[in-house]
């Protein structure tokens, strides 16, 4: 399967989700973004951090890691930013490629098989 996107974010942890949301705030259309996450859900390591202390700066309240990740996940879903879970990036190449894209990403998952992603 070939996919073309303006922005591809490798990793759906808090930084990846924040990058996607920031791109939308800067005018990038959500459908021009793709988040690739190897785990079963967005949130990264925060899903394992059950202690409080997250979110004071961003959400103005103290949250556990899973709560913080869930807030970001809901924002990503509300903006309809596409993402692929259980997706492992196998290769990333730079340089002008197909149709003038700068990056070629090879990834795979059980649902789609081999993915050729151009960004």
Task: For the regions a language model picked out, list residue spans one by one.
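Feature captures the FAD/FMN-dependent oxidoreductase FAD-binding
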Residues: 64-119
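Phosphate-binding P-loop
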Residues: 2
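Beta1-alpha1 glycine-rich phosphate/pyrophosphate-binding loop at the start
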Residues: 5-71, 75
């Amino acid at each position: 399967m070939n996919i073309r996107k303006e922005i591809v974010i490798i990793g759906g942890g808090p930084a990846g989700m924040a990058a996607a949301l920031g791109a939308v705030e800067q005018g990038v259309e959500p459908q021009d973004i793709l988040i690739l996450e190897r785990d079963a859900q967005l949130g990264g390591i925060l899903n394992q951090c059950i202690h409080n202390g997250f979110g004071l700066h961003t959400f103005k309240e103290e949250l556990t890691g899973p709560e913080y990740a869930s807030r970001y996940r809901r924002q990503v879903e509300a903006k309809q930013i596409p993402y692929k879970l259980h997706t492992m990036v196998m290769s990333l190449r730079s340089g002008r490629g197909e149709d003038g894209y700068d990056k070629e990403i090879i990834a795979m998952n059980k649902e789609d098989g081999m993915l050729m992603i151009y960004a």
